[in-house]
From Swiss-Prot:
It comes from Coccidioides immitis (strain RS). Residues 13-32 have a biased composition (Polar residues). The keyword tRNA-binding does not apply. The keyword Protein transport applies. The gene is MON1. It comes from the Eukaryota. In complex with CCZ1, is required for multiple vacuole delivery pathways including the cytoplasm to vacuole transport (Cvt), autophagy, pexophagy and endocytosis. The MON1-CCZ1 complex acts at the fusion of vesicles with the vacuole, through its regulation of the SNARE complex during the coordinated priming and docking stages of fusion, and particularly at the stage of tethering/docking. Residues 1-12, 33-44 have a biased composition (Basic and acidic residues). It holds the Pfam family Fuz_longin_1. InterPro entries: FUZ/MON1/HPS1_longin_1 (IPR043972), FUZ/MON1/HPS1_longin_2 (IPR043971), FUZ/MON1/HPS1_longin_3 (IPR043970), Mon1 (IPR004353). This is Vacuolar fusion protein MON1. Its main location: membrane. GO terms for biological process: autophagy; protein targeting to vacuole; vesicle-mediated transport.
Length: 640
């Protein structure tokens, strides 16, 4: 056989030898101590001989000296060009609306002649010359071919700066690894239209005049359903429809659940086209959510858990367990009679989009620190012995809270309280007072507390007929006690608090803060491309956000915004990803999620906005919240 052809064939069979000798050539050229040939001549030294042996199978093998040379070279240099290959955890599969799948890297596609990743490219702590390798784990990893362990290049963002001079959180001027070389595929848009407002209309009962087909079609058009049934298959609650309409579907759901209950891995969720069905089993109850909106399994499960807590707030856990232990086929609708409006208002808030439920945090009314401390002092000064918790709440936003030193309120419990007072009918606003026994499952699911609720009349100038003000403008004083005989004592405390609020002008301060509303994005960052943002402080379990006006004032626009946040939240909190930032584009808006150990930031801009402008605005929003944290958050609160 011709010697040249044999040489080409051997090169084809063992290409690693070519790479090894090429690297060996580069090494010998750069090292004066190992060879003088590269110094004396301008041309590259000739390739060394390639001794080979033939194996029993006919394949060529490198001589031992050559193999050792290749292994030695691999310890000092990369075996290929600089790479930004990522682990499988950084690869996502995006399903488009037309049904096709696209596997894409969260780091984006890279050009072949991109510069190698150097140590100076890794993002260091703002204001520090050292790389940040502690608080924030890396999201970009460089993998050396042939090595099993990925090598961390550095954090995407520096550590969140603490007290002191505000520093850039996201240094957009430094040379960084660009994770946005390729835009993420857009999140699927909700199938929303102007008829979304009819989502909350009641479905008529099926009558005897054979209107079943029409009612059934109307029921099927609903984008979201909630069912609660007992383990025996008895219907307890449904958001839409009566017993005659939902009974066949309850039977189907019960059959599916029972079929999987015998296995060690019971059914939790499944999908049918764009419809997602999530099941939450809690003791003797099954809670089911059926949704065609853009929500993940975990988000729907959190909503079902809130509905379950609403039931416990009425019955307590021991009472619920006792009812079904005595009679498993009990119809629970009788003990829950009168609470359907609470369940429905809570369910509707999820369908409209609830930022509080999404991020599992509370929103506070923006006030100066000195004003809030003044209100705290009034509550502490007026405190009576039976008081456990004292709160001032404006339209679902916390103004002030006093609590025992070793106790704090669960966000889910406060959500139940706010839903009962501000969302559901029955608690009169405009100066009325109520005495409500309530179980707070996050505090103690086995007993009742007693809640005194009284609304402040901020609009003394209004006529008596106009006292029913908007729920967003209502201010409530909520006093909670474990003593069921403390109504009159708490009423006296309320009178004292109101008197002091008027004397110190705090009442007018609260009214002015409500009328001012949430800040617009342009008030914070003039000329910004942002239309809305949602910021959660993890340490305070609180969030703040910008005004819905002017872009998200309608019900459809607000739901579309929250659906975008749901998609971002699901993406960055997925079990199989360590992504700290996510950028998505859709036909309605560009969106960005940014997650650090200290905060979560979600923001949206117009679909034609620039990505760099979006990221720079997000950085400025984070800096603004850091500067205003004692105004937008209640840090610690008042304790006794």
């Amino acid at each position: 056989m011709d010697t040249g052809k044999e040489k080409d064939r051997l090169d084809t069979e063992n290409p690693s030898l070519i790479a090894g000798n090429t690297k060996q050539q580069a090494t010998s050229q750069s090292s004066e101590s190992k060879t003088k040939l590269a110094v004396e001549k301008d041309t590259d030294p000739p390739l060394p001989s390639r001794p080979t042996t033939r194996s029993a199978t006919g394949r060529s093998k490198a001589a031992p000296d050559t193999v050792l040379s290749i292994r030695h070279a691999s310890k000092n240099v990369l075996q290929s060009k600089p790479t930004t290959a990522v682990s499988l955890q950084d690869i996502n599969s995006q399903t488009f609306q037309e049904g096709s799948n696209d596997i894409y890297s969260l780091l984006g596609a890279r050009s072949g002649n991109e510069e190698a990743i150097k140590s100076k490219c890794s993002l260091s702590r703002p204001g520090s010359g050292k790389e940040s390798d502690a608080a924030d784990s890396a999201s970009i990893k460089s993998v050396i071919p042939g090595e099993g362990t990925p090598v961390e290049v550095g954090s995407i963002f520096g550590d969140f700066t603490g007290a002191g001079q505000p520093q850039p959180l996201w240094d957009t001027k430094r040379k960084q690894v660009n994770i946005f070389d390729r835009s993420e595929p857009g999140l699927e848009d909700d199938d929303l239209s102007l008829d979304f407002e009819s989502e909350f209309d009641c479905v008529e009962d099926i009558a005897a005049d054979d209107n079943g087909d029409k009612i059934l079609e109307e029921w099927r058009q609903k984008r979201k359903h909630y069912f609660i049934l007992s383990a025996a298959g008895k219907p307890i609650y449904t958001r839409h429809g009566d017993d005659g309409l939902i009974s066949p579907y309850i039977a189907i759901i019960q059959t599916i659940i029972s079929f999987h209950q015998e296995s060690s891995n019971p059914l939790k969720s499944f999908s049918a086209g764009r419809t997602k069905i999530v099941i939450l089993s809690q003791g003797p109850l099954h809670l089911v959510a059926i949704s065609r909106l853009l929500e993940s399994d975990s988000q729907l499960r959190n909503q079902l858990d809130a509905l379950y807590m609403q039931i416990l707030s009425t019955l307590t856990l021991p009472a619920l367990q006792h009812i079904f232990a005595v009679r498993p086929s009990t119809d629970l609708r009788r003990p829950l009679q009168g609470t359907e409006s609470l369940l429905s208002s809570l369910a509707d808030s999820f369908t409209k989009g609830s930022p509080s439920t999404l991020v599992s945090a509370l929103e506070c009314l923006k006030l100066r620190k000195s004003y809030r401390q003044q209100i705290n002092s009034i509550l502490l000064k007026s405190r009576v012995e039976p008081l456990l918790y004292g709160l001032v709440v404006a339209g679902g936003r916390l103004v002030s809270v006093i609590r025992p030193k070793k106790h704090s309120l669960h966000p889910g419990d406060l959500q139940l309280i706010f839903n009962m007072i501000f969302e559901a009918d029955g608690v009169k606003a405009g100066g009325g007072e109520s005495w409500i026994p309530i179980c707070l499952p996050g505090f103690n699911s086995r007993g009742y507390l007693y809640m005194y609720v009284s609304f402040l009349d901020l609009h003394d100038h209004l006529p008596e007929d106009d006292k029913d003000i908007n729920k967003d403008d209502a201010v409530a004083i909520i006093l909670i006690s474990a003593d069921k005989e403390s109504f009159f004592v708490l009423r006296e405390m309320r009178d004292s608090v109101v008197q002091e609020l008027e004397k110190s002008n705090s009442k007018n301060i609260i009214r002015a803060a409500i009328e001012k509303g949430r800040p617009a994005t342009t008030d914070i960052v003039p000329g910004t491309v942002l239309r809305h943002f949602l910021y959660k402080s993890k340490s305070n379990v609180q969030f703040t956000m910008s005004s819905y006006s002017p872009d998200f004032t309608t019900l459809v626009a607000r739901r579309r915004l929250l659906s975008t946040y749901h998609g971002l939240h699901s993406s960055v909190h997925s079990k199989n990803t360590h992504v700290k930032v996510q950028h998505c584009a859709s036909r309605f808006m560009n969106s960005l999620a940014w997650v650090t150990p200290n905060f979560e930031l979600y923001c949206v801009a117009s679909p034609n906005s620039n990505r760099n402008a979006l990221s720079q605005s997000a950085n400025k929003i984070a800096q603004w919240v850091q500067q205003e944290d004692e105004r937008v958050f209640i840090i610690g609160g008042a304790v006794f």
